[in-house]
Amino acid sequence: MGTIRQKKKNRSSVPKTKAKRTGQLKNGNKKINVLGNAIIAENWDRKLTLTQNYRRLGLVHRLNAPAGGSEKRATKDGTIVTDPEDPLYIKSSTESIAKTLGLGEAKVERDPETGKIIRVIGNDDEVEIAGRKRRRSNPLNDPLNDLSDNEEDASAGPNKNGPSAIVQQLERQADKESSQVAKKKPRHLSKREEEWIEALIQRHGDNVSAMVRDRKLNPMQQSEGDLKRRIRKWKEMQS
C-alpha cells in the first residue's frame, strides 16, 4: 500500500513536470545542426529533404551503404536512373546468375562423387577468345570473378566530372582549418601575471627559491621551474 503523500500526489490536478531535453528530437535521436557550415547553409534548399540536399551538393549523409528504399530518379525520357553499385560488394554466384539467366535450361557442374550441384555455368563463365568461346579461368572459385566487366565504368560514373564546386570549397576550408590548428601559437602572459611576476622580482630579485617559499605572493605554491618560465617570458616582453 502506498503512503498518504503518494495517494495525494496521484489525486492532485497539478501536472507532473518533466525535464526538458534540449538537443534531442522526439524520437530520441540527437538534433544535428545541418546549417552549421556557412558554405552548406548558403547552398541549402529548405524545400528539399536532408538526403536530397546532400545529394545535390555532392555529399553523403551516411557513410554506410544503402540498405534499401533509396529514391529512384526519372529522366526526361522516362528512364529510371539508378545509383551505381558498390564496387567492393561481393556478389554471390547465385545473384549474378539469377540476373542473367531466366527460366529455362542451364549448364551445371556436379561433384563426381556425391552428384551434388557445385555451381551453375552461366554466360558470364564463358569468354570469347579469337572467335571461340572458352571457359573463364577461375581455379580458386573467387567470387570477385562474378563481378561485371562494366564495374569500373559504373563506379567511375558519378566522379567522372570530378568533385563539385561546393565540395572543392569544403575541401579548401578543411585544409585551411587543419593548417591553422597545426600551427602552435605561443602563450603570452596576461596583465595580472605580469603584475604578479613584477611584484615577485621587486621583492626577491633573482632568488627563485625565495619566491617559491613566499606564502603571500605565491599562495598557489608554483614550482621553481614554472616561475623560471614565467620570469623568462616576462623578461622577453620587457625587452
Swiss-Prot record:
Involved in the biogenesis of the 60S ribosomal subunit. This is Nucleolar protein 16. Its main location: nucleus. GO terms for cellular component: nucleolus; preribosome, large subunit precursor. Coiled coil: none annotated. GO terms for biological process: ribosomal large subunit biogenesis; rRNA processing. Belongs to the NOP16 family. Keywords: Nucleus, Ribonucleoprotein, Ribosome biogenesis, rRNA processing. Residues 1-23, 132-192, 210-239 are annotated as: Disordered. The gene is nop16. Pfam families: Nop16 (PF09420). The keyword Magnesium does not apply. InterPro entries: Ribosome_biogenesis_Nop16 (IPR019002). Component of the pre-66S ribosomal particle. It is found in: Nucleus, Nucleolus. The keyword Nucleus applies.
